[in-house]
Structures are given as C-alpha cells and as structure tokens.
Amino acid sequence: MWALRSLLRPLGLRTMSQGSARRPRPPKDPLRHLRTREKRGPGWGPGGPNTVYLQVVAAGGRDAAAALYVFSEYNRYLFNCGEGVQRLMQEHKLKVARLDNIFLTRMHWSNVGGLCGMILTLKETGLPKCVLSGPPQLEKYLEAIKIFSGPLKGIDLAVRPHSAPEYKDETMTVYQVPIHSERRCGEQEPSRSPKRSPNRLSPKQSSSDPGSAENGQCLPEGSSAGVNGKAWGRDPSLVVAFVCKLHLRKGNFLVLKAKELGLPVGTAAIAPIIAAVKDGKSITYEGREIAAEELCTPPDPGLVFIVVECPDEGFIQPICENDTFQRYQGEADAPVAVVVHIAPESVLIDSRYQQWMERFGPDTQHLILNENCPSVHNLRSHKIQTQLSLIHPDIFPQLTSFHSKEEGSTFSLPTVRGECLLKYHVRPKREWQRDTTLDCNTDEFIAEALELPNFQESVEEYRKNMQASPAPAEKRSQYPEIVFLGTGSAIPMKIRNVSSTLVNLSPDKSVLLDCGEGTFGQLCRHYGQQIDRVLCNLTAVFVSHLHADHHTGLLNILLQREHALASLGKPFQPLLVVAPTQLRAWLQQYHNQCQEILHHISMIPAKCLQKGAEVPSPPVERLISLLLETCDLQEFQTCLVRHCKHAFGCALVHSSGWKVVYSGDTMPCEALVQMGKDATLLIHEATLEDGLEEEAVEKTHSTTSQAIGVGMRMNAEFIMLNHFSQRYAKIPLFSPDFNEKVGIAFDHMKVCFGDFPTVPKLIPPLKALFADDIEEMVERREKRELRLVRAALLTQQADSSEDREPHQKRAHSEEPHSPQSKKVRAQ
C-alpha cells in the first residue's frame, strides 16, 4: 500500500497541491424519477396511485421532533423537518432525492431546524426544484439561511404560502388550513418568556455591540421585535394544517371475465372498452349491454388524511370551530382515513380536543406524535456504542434516552402513538404496519460483536496490557471531561453526527465547542434523564465558523436550555457565545422573522479574543471577564485558521494550569501551533486520509498525518483526531504517524486526561471490531493509487512520444527518399 504511493513521486504525479483552486464539479445527470416524469409529459393522467402510506420519521420525542414521510409511487412528501430528520432518512433509506414537496406546520425551530441541512443535501443530489408550503415566514427563513449557505444555486426553492389555493399533483390534492391561536403574539407562557438579563443580546442593544453595525443587521433605534413580533413577520400565533385528499383510483379491468364474455382481449379493439368501463360507463358489444361493474373492480375512493399541529391550549378552540375540518367530520363525502396529531399531552387531555377527535367517527385512525412517544430512532448509533462499550465501558458508555414524566392520555378512539418507521397504509388496504419499526436489542448487538474474528482475543489482550502497565505517578482529576458529540464532517450520517464537543470543566460548568445540527439530540442520547442538568451547567458555546455543520444546532440548545432552567427552577441567564461576528446576522434575521431568540445570547466576537486584539467596547470587555470568571479560565484565546473566511480555532487555559486547544476546521496552521504551544490536549480535525493531500487543500482541511504533525510541532501532550469525512463512517484509516500520543474520536466517546495512556491502546480492538470496514477502505485506497499510477505512466508515455516525434521528423526529412519509401507512401 505504502509502496504504491512511493511509485507516484518518481513518476512526477503530485500527491500534494501547493494551493490549487477547487476543481469545478461536472454537471449531474437528471434524477431517474425526473426523467420518467418528463417522458410521461404534462398530459399524462395516472388515475390515482396504487400505493400510499404514511411513515413516522421522528415520533416527536424530545430528541427527535415530529416528522412524517408520505410515500406514493409517483411522489414523496415530508411534513416538518426538525433537526436530525436528514440523518434519520439517510439511516433508514428514505430517499431524500425524491422529496419535491416539504410541508411545514409552523415556524418554530422544532419544525424547521433540519431544513437548512436538508436543502443543501437536496441541492447536492441534483433535485432541480423543491416546493415548501406553510407559514408566510418561510420565504424570509430561506433568505436568512443564505447568510451562511451562500446563494443556493442549482435548486429552485419555491414557497407556496398558506393562503394559496390547493396544490395538486399525480398523487393528491393538498389544502392548507391556517389556524390562529386565541393567544395573540406576546401572550406566551411565563416559563417561555423569562425576565431579560442586562447582558443579553437584544435588538436595541445590538446597535452598540461590535460588529453589528458593520454587518448592517441591527434593528433601528426605537423599534421593538419583542411583544409586537408581527411587525417584523414573526407570528407564533399561526399554525398551518394540511388536508390531503388522494385522487380516485379507478378499478382494475377483469381480463378473465372479459374473455368469458367474448370481448376482443389482446386486440386493439379492447382499449376503448377498458377506458369506458374504468370510467364507470356501460358498453354495448355485439348487441349486448355490459355494465361496468361486470368488467371492473370498484374504484378506490379518494380517501383523506389530515396533519394538524396544536402546540398549546390556545389553538384548541380555533381548531374545533374550523369550517374546513367540519366538512370532513360526520357524514363526509370523502372519508378521513387517519388524522396525525402533533400535540402535547396538555392538549390531548383537554375534553374539547377529545370531542373534536371523536367527531371524525369510529373508522378514522388517529396517530399521536409528541414527547410521550418513547422510540429509538438512531439504531446504528446505539448498536455501535453498545459494541464499543465491550472494549471500555467508561470511555464508551452505553446510550440512553429521555422519557417524559407526563402521564399519557387515554382515548376511546382507535389511537396509536408514533414510533420511528411505523407505517399506516392508506392504499391499497387501510392498515398499520409495524414490521419496519426498530428493535434496539443490545444482546443481539453484543453477540454480533463477539462473533467477529479476533475481537474477543484483542479485547483480552488489551486488558492484560493495561493491567501490566505501571500505575501513573499521580492520579489525574476527572475534569476536564471531554465528551465527543459529533465527530463527522459536512452532513449528519447514521454513525457520526456533525461537529460538536462538550468540555465539562467541573461538575457544574461546561463549554460546547461547535454546535452542529442534532447536537441536542446527541446530548439527550448521552445523558438521558440528566439532560436538563447538563443544559443548566452549560456556560458558553464556541462557534468556530459559519458552515452549517458547525452551528445549526445552536438554536435548539438555546431553546432547550431555557426549558431546562425553568423546569429545574433556576434563574434565566443568557448563554455566552463566542463566534465570528457574522453569526449575528443569521441570529438577527431568524429573530426578526421567525422566533424570538436574541434574549438567549450574550455574544463575544471571536476576533476580540485573538492575541493582542483590542476590545472595542466596555460591554464586550465585561462579557470577556464574565466568561473567564464563570469558566474559571485564565485565558480563552482564539486565532484565525486556514479554512473559510472568518474561521477560528481556540485555546482554553484553566486556572489549574491545563490547556485544551480546538482547531475547528483548518489546513495545517502555524497560528494554531503558536497559540497551542505545550497544550495538554489538542483536538484537531483529520477530515481525510493520507494520500489525499491535494483534495485536502481543495477543501481546506487536514489529513491524518498533517493533524498529528501540528500536534507534534505544538508539543501537545495528547492529540485527539476528529471531524472525519463521512467516507470513513465507522473508523478512519490509520497512518504510520500514529503513536502513543494520538487517539481517534467517536461520537459519545468520553475521555479525561487520565485516559491518555489508555486511548492509543484501544486501537487493536478497534481494528478487530471494524476489520471489514478497514479492509474495504484499504482496497479503495489501493485502487485509487493504481489509477493514479496508470494515469502517471500514460502521461509520461505521452510526453516522451511528443519529445521523440520532432526528432524523428527532423531525421526523416534529412534522409534521401529511396524508390521503396516512395512505394510505401503510395500504398
């Protein structure tokens, strides 16, 4: 393997670019389902789908806000897109590339938190257009995400406002039903509108904060986007329900019956007969009148399903009195097959809501999605963690989950609580299907690992080595404790979530280093019922840069932290956020148009913590002092790193003397080396394997050996590698530079300084656990390097032939022409 790479150098093929520009990607071929649709043409009428089912993507638990996937052979739809939905769809093979319609029931982070990542993924798949339906703020939300995503070229994002007429496609007609709460803007629950701290980042104060004026994102003096949020487009009093009516499915033509009656089956004359009877018309054949019922099965009626969200009691009466819903209750023309209720238990136990549910009749099914739906969602993550815990149960603790303590409501109706992947078939037969739901069987996971060749032996060998190792001269403190929540890059995947690392400074103080989408869900699965305590302990968040995989989990952390403080009876204080000033523009836009969040944050511009930087104002100086005091730090330093514009790394120096350095995303960076000199721990990105140095430069990331090299130059006591490309889903490839000072991070891995001698010794059992994956990656690398060798040889041959050709021409022209050569030329 390493010999192959050595062949490349004498052949003159670069293994490392000196700074080449990123190569443009070739245009993608149209997706298959779009090519099929284009062939059918605009006039094609399918007559309604044969198969339609609703499937729960996320059951509405605290770690997985409610999301519903609807399938037909013609279309795919998604209702709501909270954080983690993209990851779940990828894990459970629900095709994202087929989604051309996303319906959103309200403008709240639990409904739209995963939308940014989903849009970026849809763009990458080559989907040309996606239509978003729901609240009017959707258009402003899309404008807001462009602050950090860029212009989103290549995908047409259309917004269908809730006031638009019905939408119709090959599968169904969708009617949007706007519902306004009795509680207007500003009439929130006391726990959801805490008293504001003087240190918060408010709309008015933002004009005096550094960076806000230069970004042009502060609100005008004297304006208010708090109580009167509607003035700026924010409207929490609006939800949008969706009534979806399937197209009538024509009956099936009975071929055998037609033959019995002597009809011309198998000839061109049968086509108009089939068309007529499918339309319910009688036909006359050879003087006989034949009723449509004799030749065709009954048509499948245009059943209806309804998706409705009722966030609190203020929406109950408007829902009960809504005219559109009343048309589908009692003796309705179109029977309602199922109603999906996204509602908390406080709504479901209300007698008014239960009576409204009963009015749909006994044949209508009801699906509940809320926090009382305990369901495992990320099965692969549970499986991997269970198997890793066999190696070291403290470093790889088993996952848990958060369960609501509220008692579930009881119903006299046919009611089902959601589970991940639960299906309800509307067509061809109305029925629940549970064979796809998840079973988190830890015994099965353990048995599977124990059957792997050499795994048990390598674990036993590791334990013997640890017992034989000399005891450390001094026992190191449990703190700081590093919990890796997301160790993958770019997009959330089934094994590795995107960037986030929790540093527990003490039993009651912690800092979050980056906060990618799904960070709160990872915390829930790691800490379970202790999640509120963990959120209350969170004192600061560092956001390294504005790529979506590093900060789109922040808003959920802010909202859930507010909930945690209220539930534990603790006073509200804004969270200290160290970030590039450009983050403020996104927060301001979301606050103005979607949901009030600025009171959650006291922001410190990352540039103000660079060595030698001038602190621009007394308020920021006070916040920096508060950060150091609260976290018991001597220093919180940042430096610019080599990634995108305004990308930072950071170093935390504790009063007890230890130093933790975090690289964020970067190529090897001298400024980081200098800032991190003599670090106790360096957490450095290692996105790509060795041999992909040129790609690393194009993408402004580091390879494994480059990251280790930075740590060695820094004289770091220990190096933890993370932020691996998702091509290394379970484990990265090891380089020859790995040594006793290097470890690799996994999601939910927990280490403290006392674990430094242990972590490198985990590599042999890890290699045994993931032997098949490593073998596959090695094969891929060898094939890639062989291709490079062949390409280099061809280039070399082409160059040498070009060099020989002019010489041959000169020699040929100098020779006298013989009669034989003339004969050859003539031939």
UniProtKB/Swiss-Prot annotation:
Which cellular component appears as one GO term in the record? nucleus
Gene Ontology MF: a single term = 3'-tRNA processing endoribonuclease activity
Its main subcellular localisation, reduced to a broad class, is mitochondrion
Q: Which GO terms describe its biological process?
A: mitochondrial tRNA 3'-end processing
Top EC group: hydrolase
> Which residues does the annotated transit peptide occupy?
1-16
Cite the Pfam families for this sequence. Lactamase_B_2 (PF12706), Lactamase_B_4 (PF13691)
Q: Which domain of life is it from?
A: Eukaryota
Where Phosphothreonine occurs, residue numbers? 795
**Chain intervals for the UniProt region annotation (Disordered):** 15-46, 181-220, 794-827
UniProt keyword terms in alphabetical order? Endonuclease, Hydrolase, Metal-binding, Mitochondrion, Mitochondrion nucleoid, Nuclease, Nucleus, Phosphoprotein, Transit peptide, tRNA processing, Zinc
Q: Where in the cell is it found?
A: Mitochondrion; Mitochondrion matrix, Mitochondrion nucleoid; Nucleus
Q: Matching InterPro entries, A to Z? A: Metallo-B-lactamas, RibonucZ/Hydroxyglut_hydro, RNZ2-like, tRNase_Z_dom
Q: Which reaction does it catalyse?
A: Endonucleolytic cleavage of RNA, removing extra 3' nucleotides from tRNA precursor, generating 3' termini of tRNAs. A 3'-hydroxy group is left at the tRNA terminus and a 5'-phosphoryl group is left at the trailer molecule
- Residues in a coiled coil are none
Briefly, what is this protein's role? Zinc phosphodiesterase, which displays mitochondrial tRNA 3'-processing endonuclease activity. Involved in tRNA maturation, by removing a 3'-trailer from precursor tRNA. Associates with mitochondrial DNA complexes at the nucleoids to initiate RNA processing and ribosome assembly.
Assembly with partners or alone: Homodimer. Interacts with PTCD1.
Q: Which family does it belong to?
A: Belongs to the RNase Z family.
Name the UniProt record assigns to this protein: Zinc phosphodiesterase ELAC protein 2
User: Which organism is this protein's natural source?
Assistant: Rattus norvegicus (Rat)
Gene symbol here is Elac2
